[in-house]
Every structure is written in C-alpha cells, then in structure tokens.
Amino acid sequence: MAMKASIKGKYDTDKTSGIGSLAFNAGDIKLRATMTDATLVAGPTLTGLALAVEKPGSFIVEYNVPKKDVRFQFMNTVRIAEKPLNLTYIHSRADNRTIVDGSLVIDSANKLSANHMVGTNNCKIKYTYAHGGLATFEPCYDLAKNTWDFAVSRRFYSGDNVRATYQTSSKLLGMEWSRNNKASGFKVCASVNLADELKTPKLTAETTWNLEM
C-alpha cells in the first residue's frame, strides 16, 4: 500500500497556520486524513480533522470529524457533439448546500465552464482560452451580481506560474506567483482593494513539502 504525506505552511499578516495530510492508495481507492495545526497544538484533539475516501475521477466522500458533517462529491464525463463535458455534483449535509459544476472542453485551447448553487440564483459562467499551452485568459460572468471577473496567467518552462486577477464587484486586484514539483512547492500572493482609500496590500505565502513512501 503506497502512502503519500504532505505538509503545508501558510503565513499572512494576521496569522500563521499549517495543514498536514496522509493519503493511502488501496487499489483504485484513496484513503486520506487531513489535519490542521489546531489538531496537534492543543492536544491532540479532533479539531480540524477530516477523513476522506476517494476514487479519482469518480467520487469523494469527506467526513469532518468535529463538525460531524459529511460532504459528497461525484464526478462524471459525458460527450456532447463528440466534446467531453465534465460534470461535478457536490453536496454538504450540514448546510444542505448543493453545487453543480460543468466544464465543456471545446478543443485544446477553449473551454466553457458553469457553476450553479441549486436553489439560488448564484451562477457563474467562465470562458478559458489557452494560448500556446503557456498563457491563459479567463473572463468570468457572475449572473447573480451582474459583474465580471478576469484572470490572466502565464506558465514558464522553469515550472513557475504567474497569475493576475481582478474582481470588478469588489475592485480587488490580485497577483500570485507559484511553483510546484514532485517534492515541494510554494505560492506567494498579494492583493489590494482599489476601493480602499489606503490601498494597503495583503500578503500571504504558502510552502508545501511532499513525501512519497
């Protein structure tokens, strides 16, 4: 039985936190336990502990131990006019919330996605255009707010990825720099609210270490 472990540390201007996970592969089923720093610092306790059973590409069942909440996620792919449509159904029992997500891959460069919370008018439609496999442009329309969000990203052969986002509803401008490989990764984010008179930037940094046994 193969085992994978990962540790993620996060620092921002307000606090420092950590998340750890252990995953075991049992055939085509993956068993995963996730813990936050609150699980170990004060105890050990059950705070921040979540257990999950996953079959990649098919389903995920996650149990939040302290909240006694179950979250179901089911994935499937159908074909429309020979184009793959990836569907995801997510239901959280505690707040009785259901989300349906669909993504239609038109070709290698174009993708159309929609996300809808059942029983509400919350719906977002996003178009993704990938240029040359390195640059990506993503406009997103929020039907409930009648606003647009935009994201532009650029991937480099070194493994670095730079991403810029702008939310027109909140006037929030964000920048992100990340790098991921098999053993480790990091992400540095900066955001500023352009509607804020002071326009004070908020900085966060994440580091991830991966171990496979």
From Swiss-Prot:
GO terms for cellular component: chloroplast; chloroplast envelope; chloroplast outer membrane; etioplast membrane; plastid; pore complex. It comes from the Eukaryota. One of its GO terms (molecular function) is porin activity. Its main location: plastid. The chain crosses the membrane at residues 4-13, 19-28, 33-42, 56-64, 71-80, 94-103, 109-118, 123-132, 145-156, 160-168, 171-179, 202-211. Residues 14-18, 43-55, 81-93, 119-122, 157-159, 180-201 are chloroplast intermembrane. Keywords: Chloroplast, Ion transport, Membrane, Plastid, Plastid outer membrane, Porin, Transmembrane, Transmembrane beta strand, Transport. High-conductance voltage-dependent solute channel with a slight selectivity for cations transporting triosephosphates, dicarboxylic acids, ATP, inorganic phosphate (Pi), sugars, and positively or negatively charged amino acids. Belongs to the plastid outer envelope porin OEP24 (TC 1.B.28) family. Homooligomers form large rather nonselective pores in plastidial outer membranes. This is Outer envelope pore protein 24B, chloroplastic. It comes from Arabidopsis thaliana. The gene is OEP24B.
